[in-house]
Amino acid sequence: MAAPMLRLGFPGRRWALTWLDGGSRHRSGSQTGPTSNWARRQSSVAQPSLHTAQKPRKGEHKWAAVVGLEIHAQISSNSKLFSGAQVCFAAPPNSLVSYFDASLPGTLPVLNRRCVEAAVMTGLALNCHINKKSLFDRKHYFYSDLPAGYQITQQRLPIAANGHLTYCIYLGKKPSQVTTKTVRIKQIQLEQDSGKSLHDDLRSQTLIDLNRAGIGLLEVVLEPDLCCGEEAALAVRELQLILQALGTSQANMAEGQLRVDANISVHHPGEPLGVRTEVKNLNSLRFLAKAIDYEIQRQITELENGGEILNETRSFDYKLGCTMPMRDKEGKQDYRFMPEPNLPPLVLYDDTSLPRGADSQQVINIDQLRDMLPELPSATRERLVQQYGMLPEHSFALLNEVGLLEFFQNVIKETRTEPKKVTNWVLNTFLCYLKQQNLAVSESPVTPSALAELLNLLDRKAISSSAAKQVFEELWKGEGKTAAQIVSEQQLELMQDQEALEKLCQTTIDGHPQVVMDVKKRNPKAINKLIGLVRKASHSRADPALIKKILERKLSL
């Protein structure tokens, strides 16, 4: 039997629990981004837009943009923040809902230790001050996917505050022109996620799935230190990498594990800040950048035409490429914050304040968690540059694709090829094939061992560079053959017979007197042409370096 789905009809807005089958042909989701497998892997690829938002041209209008972000990251935990219900993205609707999640009378919250540890580790990684005492509050508002009518959050005294995030930004067209910028972090707070509403326009109904209700969230509030969509996207991407390195959140935007709200305003430099608008629920980095840049340009255009900016909430229509008004915020909503009466203050300790004889399972030690912090992305990039001598932009590329750094390091372990060549093959060949077929690293038919074997053959000069590319193409077919087998079957080995190479070179010299004449005139292109003719005659099995030596000797160059 299918799992139950809460159905909420519009007319009377009454709750009713009904059994629905697995079909949902006419159900339209509330997500604003792509949900296909292709789109999940290619979150950076936007759909064609009808309205193109251009970045404000600096100096022409003399406008300054101010952008602040509120980032909601779903905590990686086995159970929810205040209940024992399991966390699973793909579970059937309403199959992972405890009595507390459904807000049945008499149920009480029990704080999840793992979520607190995740918040502390994230705060430490983001250079925040960890508050040894933090408080929980109720934030009241009515929405159909929030059964209790309030959300448990940390409005008064959050678990972490006053941090900063350093991210890198490209100054020009060349990838090597990289600089770092810093955005301040106002606070990090623990809070509950809400359920999910799926709007059925055909039947004028809203379907409620409470599987997500009560999952632990980290809300990271960035100060308005950003000025454009590109900066915002790069800052969020760096935060995403940090969360994934810590293991505190999978931060998969396609699955709603990382959602961003952007607060945007424009003003003339030296004047007070303008009226801000909030763009909600941006679920991809590309859409985040496009939405912010569009909204900046929209506000500038509105003000220059004599209009005014409303303090409103907007959404981003990824199909049209523009923001649309959702609801007016002029009449500021009163969330009626109040202390959560069912949760005592959250008290943390460090080595200096830890009570003597305290049970480690009953307390959380900040210093102990600090010692458990893994290598963060910035340190990893610096290590890659120093250890392997790679360019900074290459270290960024290795970390930017999930699983690519691990793939690279596994290849390095199994080959004696110099790291620069391995980097070149991983980024320019392997990654190119992945992108062409929209595959994740984990889905690649070429394993690190297979690529390492191919590079070893190339390093020993058993095959040429062009032959290596042929072998890689065969490996990509995933037929289970090794690189050595492919080389043997297709006779791609370099010619080792010196006498045969001598004859081949002499035959080429005799057959192309005009090219030989050009070579003797010191035409640099002519010698390369002659080498190419010899390689063609050898079916690309002759070593170009060896051919060049033989030709130079024969032609007395």
UniProtKB/Swiss-Prot annotation:
Function, as annotated: Allows the formation of correctly charged Gln-tRNA(Gln) through the transamidation of misacylated Glu-tRNA(Gln) in the mitochondria. The reaction takes place in the presence of glutamine and ATP through an activated gamma-phospho-Glu-tRNA(Gln).
The main enzyme category here is ligase
Question: Transit peptide range?
Answer: 1-30
Alphabetized SUPFAM superfamilies for the sequence: GatB/YqeY motif (SSF89095), Glutamine synthetase/guanido kinase (SSF55931)
| N6-succinyllysine PTM positions | 529
Task: List where Polar residues composition bias occurs.
Answer: 29-52
What's an example GO BP annotation here?
glutaminyl-tRNAGln biosynthesis via transamidation
Annotated compartments? Mitochondrion
Which InterPro entries does this entry report, sorted A to Z?
Asn/Gln-tRNA_amidoTrfase_suB/E, Asn/Gln-tRNA_Trfase_suB/E_cat, Asn/Gln_amidotransferase, Asn/Gln_tRNA_amidoTrase-B-like, GatB, GatB_Yqey_C_2, Gln-tRNA_amidoTrfase_suB_CS, Gln_synth/guanido_kin_cat_dom
Pfam families given for it? GatB_N (PF02934), GatB_Yqey (PF02637)
Report quaternary structure and partners: Subunit of the heterotrimeric GatCAB amidotransferase (AdT) complex, composed of A (QRSL1), B (GATB) and C (GATC) subunits.
PANTHER family reported in the protein's UniProt record: GLUTAMYL-TRNA GLN AMIDOTRANSFERASE SUBUNIT B MITOCHONDRIAL AND PROKARYOTIC PET112-RELATED, GLUTAMYL-TRNA(GLN) AMIDOTRANSFERASE SUBUNIT B, MITOCHONDRIAL
UniProt lists the family membership as follows: Belongs to the GatB/GatE family. GatB subfamily.
Q: What is its EC number?
A: 6.3.5.-
Which catalysed reactions does the entry list for this protein?
Answer: L-glutamyl-tRNA(Gln) + L-glutamine + ATP + H2O = L-glutaminyl-tRNA(Gln) + L-glutamate + ADP + phosphate + H(+)
The record's keywords, sorted A to Z, are: ATP-binding, Ligase, Mitochondrion, Nucleotide-binding, Protein biosynthesis, Transit peptide
One GO cellular component term: glutamyl-tRNA(Gln) amidotransferase complex
Official protein name in the record: Glutamyl-tRNA(Gln) amidotransferase subunit B, mitochondrial
Q: Where is the stretch described as Disordered?
A: 21-58
This chain's source organism reads: Mus musculus
Print the organism lineage.
Eukaryota, Metazoa, Chordata, Craniata, Vertebrata
Molecular function terms in GO for this entry? ATP binding; glutaminyl-tRNA synthase (glutamine-hydrolyzing) activity
